[in-house]
Every structure is written in C-alpha cells, then in structure tokens.
Amino acid sequence: MQLFDVYSLWNIEPVEAKGCRVWDKEGTEYLDLYGGHAVISIGHSHPKYVDSICKQAAKIGFYSNSVLNSLQQELATKLGQLSGYSDYSLFLCNSGAEANENALKLASFKTGKKRIIAFKEAFHGRTSGTVAVTDNPSVQAPFNKGHEVVFVNLNDIESVEEEISKGDVAAVIIEGIQGVAGIFQPTDSFLKQLDSVCKTNNVPLILDEIQSGYGRTGKFFAHQYANIKPDIITTAKGMGNGFPIGGVLISPEFEAKKGMLGTTFGGNHLACAAAIAVLDVIVEESLVNNAFNMGEYLQQELNKTPAVKAIRGRGLMLGIELKPEFSDVRNQLLFESHIFTGGAKNGVMRLLPPLSISKGDIDIFLSELKNKTA
C-alpha cells in the first residue's frame, strides 16, 4: 500500500529530537524554530513529559468515556487555574479541527441558528464545519459548501454588526492571531468591540486559540491582551506537545446535556498524562514569561535587520516579511544553516519555536539570517 500523496515534503527525515533540536537519519542537527506547526510547546522529548507518558502507558493507556477518568478532572483543574478560566467547563477531544467543530456545534445548539461569521484569510481546520469557516475554497469539497458562512474583513466591526443585525447568526469565530494567513492579529480594541457586540446580541463568540494559545504569545491565550472573556475557547497543538489532544473551554452559560457531544479517544489516559505534564512544565519553567521575553528580544533584534520589511505577531508567534530579493532565505536557512522555520501566505516566514527557547538559540538564528541577507 502507498501513502495518499497530499503533503509537500522536505527531503529530511527527523529521527530524534531534544529541546529545540532535531536530528535527521544522517545525524545532521537542526535548530527547530517551528515546532511542527507550533505543536512543540515545552521542547522535544522533555524528561518530565516522557516520564509521565511512559508511566501512564505502563498502567492504563486507554478506556472509553463510559467510565470515570480522574486524569480528565486533574487536567481541567490545572488548565482552569493556569488560564484564568476556572469557572469554565472543559470538553476534551483529539485535535484542533475537532475542537472547533464541537465549538460551532455548541453555539448552534444554544442559539438554534446556523449561520456563522468568520474572517477573511481564516484557517480553522479541515472537518466539514471547520473547513467551511476556513477562507480557502481550494480545500473545500462540494460536500462542505452547504454550511451558511459569511466572511468579513478582520478588524471591521461595522461589517460584523451588519451581519449580526440580520438575526440569524449562530456564532462568530476568530483566531487569536491568524497563523496561516501570515500572522495577522485582531487589534485589542477590535476584540473588545467584538466581545461587546456579541454579548449585546446574545451571539456566542468563539476564540480559536489552537495556534496562538498555551502561552505562545506571552499570555496563556492571545485574546487575554484585550481583557475579554469569550464564550468558547478552543485549544490543541501546544496542549499535548506532540500527543494528539484538543480542548473546548466552555462558558457557564452553556448547559451540558448527555450525548450532545462525544468522542471515542478524546481525553484518554495517555493524552491526559501528556497534557498534565505540559502544564506542569509550563509552570515550573515559567515558559509563558519566557515566551514573552524571548519574543520581545526577537522583535527588537529583527527590527535592526535591513532585509526585514515587516514583523507581526506577539511572543513566540511571529511572522517575518522579508524584502522580495530574499524570497529564498527560508530554503537557505534549512538546507545550509540547518534551521527549521515555517511558511505562510505571501512568503511570510513564521517563527513558532518551543516556548523554552533560549537567547543563545535565538542569536544563532539572527546571525544566520543576517548572513543570508547581507
């Protein structure tokens, strides 16, 4: 059997990883400033993380959600305390797309409506509902196009108000920072207005924090810079540091009913053990503060680099727009300097390193970037 060929792949096969480093099968060492799409939050193969998973696997790795699992409540309690959402409820699933799909369902259940407001250039996932609210027709099959969705410009509150005034909106969904689009963020003032408009009109606001959450921006969630509390928050990626897990944080305004949501694998013992270890390490190593400080340092130094046209983002979720003559720098960094970075629309370089990255590793990147653009 062959693999279904849908991925554009680099001719590199990592076989080992530790901290902010990966090694390929030839033994070449790479500095990882991408973390596999912002998944690696506490660093590759963190000892506490590895120990937690191994010990749990030796006890019980899985049983379905037909029995008690105290690890789920331990995870919910720690996540609530660290994120500032102790009064919310947690639904556990397996991925970001699944988290967003369930968030959209919850909003529709509550309002009895089905039309969704999303934002141009958004990316929310590849399941039927999430791909419908993703502004990319090339990944939408005819089957996905029956959903009622309207896309408005980011930071355009008038367009949001106009759509909500029609009275048929089930929810508004927005990314804490748009990642795939090229690192574009809603302004704090816009998020405050959006939160106010949604609350006034009883329209649930869903904050997709799958890429921007879990401390990446220097706060636990990116929307917390705006001091708002959305109705639903979704998370995944950095939540499991590579182990598949997703979560939906749900306001007390939503009433749980048996069977309204469900999953076979979501919240299994291994996934919870991984996610608990991630939260423990984030606290013990002050990784949210490190993300803020290292992000500030990165932006400060990048602003001194003549080849850089623009820098966007917060903390360790940054987009670097280089001048056109340096369009091949990402390839040069990967194949000559052995540094992984990410891409986004319009040639933007995305930096999404582990939250544990050191100033020394950032300096290596900055030095190589300057050399390649001199």
Label every PLM stretch briefly.
Residues 1-374:
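Conserved N-terminal phosphate-binding loop of PLP-dependent enzymes in the Aspartate aminotransferase
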